[in-house]
Structures are given as structure tokens and as C-alpha cells.
Amino acid sequence: MKTKIIIYICIWATAWAIPVPQLVPLERDIVEKSADVPFLAHPGTAAQNELHINNATNDDSPKGSELGRQVHSNGGYERDRNGSESIAVGGKSSPTQPILANAQGNSAKEREDVETYGHDGIHAGGENSTANGIRGQVGIAENAEEAKESKVHGQPHQDTKTGLASDTSQNGDATLVQENEPQVAGSKNSTNHEVGTHGSGVAAQETTPQREGEGSENQGAEVTPSIGEGAGLDNTEGSPSGNGIEEDEDTGSGDGVGADAGDGRESHDGTEGHEGQSSGGNNDNRGQGSVSTEDDDSKEQEGSPNGRGGDNTSSSEETGIEEGDGTQTTQDNQNLSPTEGGIISQAEACPSGQSQNQGLETEGSSTGNKSSITKESGKLSGSKDSNGHHGMELDKRNSPKQGESDKPQGAAEKSDTHNNMGHSRIGSSSNSDGHDSYDFDDESMQGDDPNSSDESNGSDGSDDANSESAIENGNHGDASYTSDESSDNGSDSDSHAGEDDSSDDTSDTDDSDSNGDDDSESKDKDESDNSNHDNDSDSESKSDSSDSDSDSSDSSDSSDSSDSSETSDSSDSSDTSDSSDSSDSSDSSNSSDTSDSSDSSDGDSSDGDSSDSDSSDSDSSNSSDSDSSDSSDSSSSDSSDSDSDSKDSTSDSSDDNSKSGNGNSDSDSDSDSDSEGSDSNHSTSDD
């Protein structure tokens, strides 16, 4: 027995001992091989990028310091070149730097390359480059503040004109590297990249926004650092595309981008610029929240027909939002103006993207006070253009349908892209269901289209937005909306389609408009109250979120009816920021709201959205009463201005109530119920 036991033990010991040496070396070999493979592949690839990036970034971090010094001292081209060196953070410092310094066209191309390489390098060496780039960005942000405090406003405009695109792309890559961590950093430069990542409008948006303003890239640069500095973006966009001074930029782009850029430029202007900064900067921050969200749909919108047109605008803008928000805002803050500097401050202050959304909306709203209505029109579709711009941010998220919506208002590609999008999508954006709301909005818009005769006035989403706009606008001051929006927004013809009816009815008979346009629409709303009122409550969901946003945005709309409308869009875009954007929009833009209650159509629009949904619902029931009060407010643009202020505040309250579901009594509650129903329907539609 002992012998057997000993033999057994020996056998067991040998059996146990033999595999161990075999398995251990095999595992070691496997581990070593596998370790070697990742280290070779990952560091090999990343190491190159990281080498370039880290070298460029380490160089650029000092260069960022030098940037600050040189930018502060030199103000202009050294910023560009240091910006190029910052782009060198992207990894292609020398080619990028000379080319960017050499030409904007090259800087656009280079920007693409820099985006490509820099973005890859950034992703590859993103951590190091992000850390270093963040250092550089800190230096840049500080330098941007210095620059913005320094002659940044003056010289950077020159730089903006001359080297803004390059400077922006440079800053974009630098900032990308800097803020590559958030992927919004990727969105910065990589909004083109990220757009490229999305792949819908990759080359188109990279190339087109770059071509458009070369501010896409610049905007891409902007996007991440500020995270949604639509002003900076628009500045970038307006600057490169406009290649003009702030004001020229304002008209320089000529596009919605130009308007946005112009508004951003106005933000550069430092007058509206700072105001646009405050609302614009805040809006930009809000816009940036939109940016991230939008960027997802930004690719879609980029994929959209207007993804090219509107996306060049929108994409540039949204790239500007996504892309252009941060970096160029950073160095546009350095380069462009204290406004964008303020935007950076606001962007830094509001990195959440809340204020940036407003800024984008604000800038987008510079596309038109349309935009300011947009938020409401987002609900109202009336400010489709400005909504378009803001909707762009929003539409970026939901751009495919936006593309559909874009088509009707193709003239205002951004706004058009955003109009329908802005309308349904703002609601959807507001409904942080963005896509869900949007799809539901499109569907409900389309559903409203059949349901509501007004919605058949124009295109599907546009008319839906329009009829909803008209409805809401008809009630909430289609006259004022139409007066503001109709006057401002020729391309609100869709909105005017319902809105002129509504506007005529509203201006002639606001109650009739509410009863007629809005009543029929509202009765369609009431009949299709779930569909239209789902739209309405989609709008009211938008009014719920969007009205909150719209409220903030309406407040924002009222604040910068154009800016705020885009802010409302950005508010809508910032669904997460939505409440915050309601706070920011409502607070910042509400102050502006009361200020720019002159955009009472916005206030009215928000009222019109909430109250006019209210009036629409109430309008069917109490069409002349609610609609009288609403339409009175709405029809009295001035009264609705005052009312817009109070009602904007009320609209804020009622939109907050709308968020609460209390709404403007009937329709807001209904809309809120419908809004939740429509939110459910949003989800359902999207589902």
C-alpha cells in the first residue's frame, strides 16, 4: 500500500509537474507575443502619431505659451503660425504650418490633411496630445483671453480674414489635440473628422465647410475647445467664408453661415458680439451641447442634401458648432475678438454647451430674427431659417429629415435644414429625443400635414412646422411672428404659408387666425391634437422641452430673437442642456428675452408655442378668448413684445410650466400631456 501510495504520489507529482513547465512557457510566449503585437501595433501606430503629436504638442504647449505671448504681442499671423504649430499638434506641424500660414485654401486642404492626420494623431496620441494640447489650450485659452483682451478683436479679424481659416484650422488641430479627450475635441477638428467619422458629409463637410468658410475646420477647431462656440464658429465660418471683417463677415459669408458667421462676427464685433457672446456665447455654449448631439446627426445632415448646402452652412456651422466652437473660438477668442474671447470665457464658463447653444442660436439667429422665432418656430417652424440655423445644430442630429425639411427652405440651407428640423427637431432636440422627437415631428409633422390643412401649406415638415408655426404663430403672434419673422424671414414663406394666412388672419383677425388658421389648425391640432398637438405638443414637447428650451429659447428667441432662436435651437439641441439651457436661455436669453422681447414674435412664438398651442387647443375651445389674448399679444407685435417680455417670462414660466406640464393652461397641459404623449409618440415614431 505504501508503495502504491508512493507511486501514485510520484505519478501525480510528475503529471502535475510536467504540464506546468509546458504551459508556463507557452503562456509566456503567448503573452510576450501578444504583448509585442499590441505594443508594436498600437504604440507603433500611435507612437508615430504620438511622437508627432507629443513632439508637436510638447512643442505646441510651449508654442501655446508662445502663442499666448506671440498672439498677445503679435496678435495676428504668429497666432496663425503658432496656430499652425498648434495644428502641428495634429501631427503635421511643418506642412500644416506653412500651408496654413500660406493660404486659406491650402489651409482648408491642409486642414483636411491636418484633420486627417492631426485627428488620427490626436486620437492616437490623444491622451498625450490632449494633455499637452490641453496645456497648450490652457495657454491658448489664457492667450486667447490675452488676445481677446489684446488686439485680438482688431488684428484677429485681420487674422480672421487673412489667416482665420488657417489660424482656425491650426487652432482647430491644436485645440483638437488639446481637447481630443472629449471626442468633441475630435469633433472640433474632427467634426469634419467626426463628420468624417460619421462619414456622411466627411469630405463634403470637411471640404465644403472648409471651402465655405474653411471655418468648418476652423469651426472644427472651435468646436471642441469651447465646445459649441457657435459664435466662434460662426466667426470662423463667417470669417473664412466671409473673409471679411466682423461686419463683412456678418454679410461676408452671405450664407446662413455668413449670417451665423456674421452673427458670430457680430459677436466678433464685440457689440452684438459681446451680446452675442453673452447670449451668443452662452448660446454658443448651448450650441455646443448641440454640437455633440448635432454632430451625431451632423453627419446625417452632412449626408443630407443640405448636408452639403445646409451642412456646408450647417455643417460648417455645426462643424463650427461642433468643430468650430472650441478651437477657433479659442484662438478666435485670441484672434477674432473679445467677443469670441468672451465666448471662450462663456464657453469655459458654459462648457456644458448651454450658453453656446444660445450663441449658435444667437448667431444662427443673426441669420434672421427668424432664428429667434425659430425656437418657437422650432416649435413654430416659422423661424425655420433661424430655426434652420439652430435647427442645423439640431438638424445635424436629425439632419436626414432635416434634409427633407431642408429642401423646402433650401434657400436658407441652414435655417432650412433647421427649419423643419428646427421645428420638429427643435422640439425633438428639446425633447432630447432629438431624433425621436424629430422623427415623430416629421411623422407628426407629416401626420399633421394630412391632419392639418395648414401644414399642407408648404412642405411636409416645413408646413407642419409652418402650420404648427402658423398655428402657434397664428396664435402667438403670427402677426408679431410674421411681422418679425415674416419681415425678417422671406424664406419663412413656409412659415408664411401658414403664417401669412395666420399672419393675415392673425394680424387681421388673430382670433380668426387662431380660430381660422390656428383654429382649423388647432382644430386639426385638436382633431389631430395628438398628432398636431403632438406636434404642437411635439412643439409643445418641444414646448415641453423645446418650450422650456423654446422658453429658454423663446426667452432666448426673445432675447436674441435670431440668436436666441438659434439658441432655442441650440437649447433644443442641448437637450441635456435643455433644462440648463432653459436656465441659460431663459436666464441669459430671458434677460435678453426681455431685452430682445422686441422679438416678441419669439416671445409670442414661445407664448404662441405654449400659449398658442394653448390658444390652439384653447383656441378651438376658447379660440377667440385665449387666442384673443394670445393673438392680441401675438397680433400686437408691440403688445406681444411687452407681452412677449411678460409672456416670454410667462413663456418661460409657461414653458417651464410647459415643461411642468402646466403650460399655458389648456394646450400647454394638453401639449404637455400631448407633449409626453408626443414624446412617447416621438419614441414610438422613432421606434
Curated annotation (Swiss-Prot):
List the residue ranges of the region (Disordered). Answer: 54-113, 146-687
The entry annotates sugar attachment on N55, N82, N128, N189, N312, N369
UniProt modification remark: DSP is glycosylated.
Compositional bias, Polar residues, is annotated for 93-107, 161-194, 276-292, 352-375, 418-432
* Induction pattern: Down-regulated by the CEBPB-NFE2L1 heterodimer during odontoblast differentiation.
Statement: the UniProt record of this protein carries the keyword Secreted:
yes
Q: Which residues carry this modification: Phosphothreonine?
A: T57, T319, T329
Query: Where in this protein does the record say Phosphoserine is found?
Result: S226, S253, S278, S292, S298, S315, S337, S345, S366
Signal sequence extent:
1-17
Tissue specificity remark = Specifically expressed in teeth, mainly in odontoblasts and transiently in pre-ameloblasts.
Q: Name one GO molecular function term.
A: collagen binding
| GO biological process terms, semicolon-separated | ameloblast differentiation; amelogenesis; biomineral tissue development; branching involved in ureteric bud morphogenesis; cartilage development; cell differentiation; cellular response to cell-matrix adhesion; cellular response to dexamethasone stimulus
Q: Where is the composition biased (Low complexity)?
A: 447-460, 555-598, 618-639, 678-687
Q: State the UniProt keywords alphabetically.
A: Biomineralization, Calcium, Extracellular matrix, Glycoprotein, Phosphoprotein, Secreted, Sialic acid, Signal
Secreted: is it a keyword of this entry? yes
Compartments annotated for it: namely: Secreted, Extracellular space, Extracellular matrix
What is the protein's given name? Dentin sialophosphoprotein
- Which organism was this protein described from? Rattus norvegicus
Q: Which gene encodes it?
A: Dspp
